[in-house]
UniProtKB/Swiss-Prot annotation:
Pfam families assigned: His_Phos_1
Enzyme class at the top of the EC tree: isomerase
Pathway: Carbohydrate degradation; glycolysis; pyruvate from D-glyceraldehyde 3-phosphate: step 3/5
HAMAP family referenced in this protein's UniProt entry, alphabetically: PGAM_GpmA (MF_01039)
EC number assigned by the record: 5.4.2.11
Residues binding substrate, per UniProt: 8-15, 21-22, 60, 87-90, 98, 114-115, 181-182
Protein known as: 2,3-bisphosphoglycerate-dependent phosphoglycerate mutase
Gene: gpmA
Length: 244
């Protein structure tokens, strides 16, 4: 048996302002800093001590990993970063207010863009592509998205799962993945075999560790949040985003 922990980054400044964030590199809010620290405290209290961390190239996830490791007394463990764990690219919606977008385009279109499995938002223009960011300098231009649906996130995340995370799990390491709402939804979809339709109803709260116990074939034996009551309340708040 091996342990995998998924941790969505703490609240970001754009989460607080109800904006679509995607690949924009926004840092944690004051609340988010506390959430990330509390996530690490929950790990320590549960005796779930990471041996290795995988995170994205975005500051809010990296800082969450740092704060959680510090609170858990595990600052020395290796931290591996990959663009494949980045948040879903929200295309032309990035930077827009969710409530205003809902009002402008209507409930049906808003939910299609936000929660459907295979409907991406409008693309950004070539002048906005994240390739101008030096963190993606070694990434082939055709891999840098202009928009993504969740299916696209699954497609780019799974190679990293198999090539980087699975070997750590098979070596018996306790693995922490500190990432984003949609990159973690993509991973949960894979782990729990959630259908393309049902995944629309999955919401992952910020800063609360989700623990999986996996068998030798990496099948799920059990899973659950380390603070179930807080997770249920926070997930409901995520589902309600878009409302003023």
């Amino acid at each position: 048996m091996t342990t995998l922990v998924l941790l969505r980054h703490g609240e970001s400044n754009w989460n607080r302002e109800n904006l679509f964030t995607g690949w924009v590199d926004v840092d944690l809010s004051e609340k988010g800093l506390k959430e990330a620290t509390r996530g690490g405290e929950l790990l320590a209290e549960a005796g779930v001590l990471p041996d290795v961390v995988h995170t994205s190239l975005l500051t809010r996830a990296i800082r969450t990993a740092w704060l959680a490791l510090d609170a858990a007394g595990r600052t020395w463990v290796p931290v591996r970063r990959s663009w494949r764990l980045n948040e879903r690219h929200y295309g032309g919606l990035q930077g827009l207010n969710k409530a205003e977008t809902l009002e402008k385009f209507g409930e049906e279109q808003f939910q299609l863009w936000r929660r459907s499995y295979d409907t991406p938002p409008p693309e950004i223009g070539p002048e906005q592509v994240s390739g101008v960011d030096e963190r993606y300098a070694d990434l082939a231009p055709d891999l840098i998205p202009r928009t993504e649906c969740l299916a696209d996130v699954v497609a780019r995340m799974l190679p990293y799962w198999y090539d980087a995370i699975v070997p750590d799990l098979r070596a018996g390491r306790t693995v922490l993945v500190a990432a984003h709402g949609n990159s973690l939804r993509a991973l949960v979809k894979h782990l729990d075999h959630i259908s393309d339709t049902d995944i629309a109803g999955l919401n992952i709260p910020t800063g609360i560790p989700l623990r999986y116990e996996l068998d030798d074939d990496l099948g799920v034996l059990s899973s659950g949040y380390l603070d179930p009551d807080a997770a249920a309340s926070a997930a409901a708040a995520v589902a309600a985003q878009g409302k003023k």
